[in-house]
Curated annotation (Swiss-Prot):
Pfam families in alphabetical order: TMP-TENI (PF02581)
InterPro entries: Aldolase_TIM, ThiamineP_synth_sf, ThiamineP_synth_TenI, TMP_synthase
UniProt-listed GO biological process terms: thiamine biosynthetic process; thiamine diphosphate biosynthetic process
Organism of origin: Listeria welshimeri serovar 6b (strain ATCC 35897 / DSM 20650 / CCUG 15529 / CIP 8149 / NCTC 11857 / SLCC 5334 / V8)
Gene name of the record: thiE
Gene3D superfamilies: Aldolase class I
The name this protein goes by in its record: Thiamine-phosphate synthase
Top-level EC class as recorded in UniProt: transferase
UniProt pathway annotation: Cofactor biosynthesis; thiamine diphosphate biosynthesis; thiamine phosphate from 4-amino-2-methyl-5-diphosphomethylpyrimidine and 4-methyl-5-(2-phosphoethyl)-thiazole: step 1/1
Length: 208
């Protein structure tokens, strides 16, 4: 699992500033991303279930072509319906116990955490495969993001003995990735670092 978290790309149609989500995703896959999470939320996102399913299937097909895990954000019904490789939920999304009941043994389960206590609870659950920790730095990609925590939260979680794989998220780019990994993350999640790049593959090469 840790290797799959190395460069974890997250995006939905609302994040794309040039081209289409499938075209940007394929460039990112060619560049070497190790995981993709389809996250359709916020202003500019697809609004109907049928539109989201159609887009999810197109992205899933691309991920399969490049043998990269395809994760769905906060939509258990869709994830189960299309046979996604994983589901990722936040603290305020679908109740994690319900997600575990529905998805454990069928796909990977990721959970966002913002504190040591939330990380400890994720590990106690026994069915969470990895945790997303952040936002580490200020981010423009999530209007409802928690206040940034800096890399210290990663160090605190590791000092607490948490063994779950960790992917850092929030404002991570080529300039600060080394700091995030040194603090204890196994990989990084990025949105705008890729979607707003002039050269997707160059950015990814600098993140690997």
């Amino acid at each position: 699992m840790k290797e799959e978290l190395a460069v974890y790309f997250i995006a939905g149609t609302q994040d794309i500033v040039r081209g289409t989500l499938p075209s940007v995703l394929e460039e990112a896959l060619k560049g070497g991303i190790t995981c993709f999470q389809y996250r359709e939320k916020g202003a500019g996102s697809l609004q109907t279930a049928s539109e989201r399913k159609e887009m999810a299937l197109e992205c899933q097909k691309l991920c399969a072509k490049y043998q990269v895990p395809f994760i769905i954000n906060d939509d258990v019904v869709l994830a189960l319906e299309i046979g996604a490789d994983g589901i990722h939920v936040g603290q305020n999304d679908e109740e994690i116990h319900q997600v575990i009941t529905s998805c454990a043994g069928k796909m990977k389960i990721g959970l966002s955490v913002h504190s040591v206590s939330e990380a400890e609870e994720a590990e106690r659950l026994g069915a969470v495969d990895y945790i997303g920790v952040g936002p580490i730095f200020p981010t423009i990609s999530k209007a409802d993001a928690e206040p940034e925590s800096g890399t210290e939260i990663l160090k605190e979680i590791r000092r607490a003995g948490i063994k779950l794989p960790i992917v850092g998220i929030g404002g991570i780019n080529e300039a600060n990735i080394a700091e995030v990994l040194a603090a204890g993350a196994d990989g990084v999640s990025v949105i705008s670092a890729i979607t707003r790049a002039d050269d997707y593959q160059l950015v990814i090469a600098n993140l690997i």
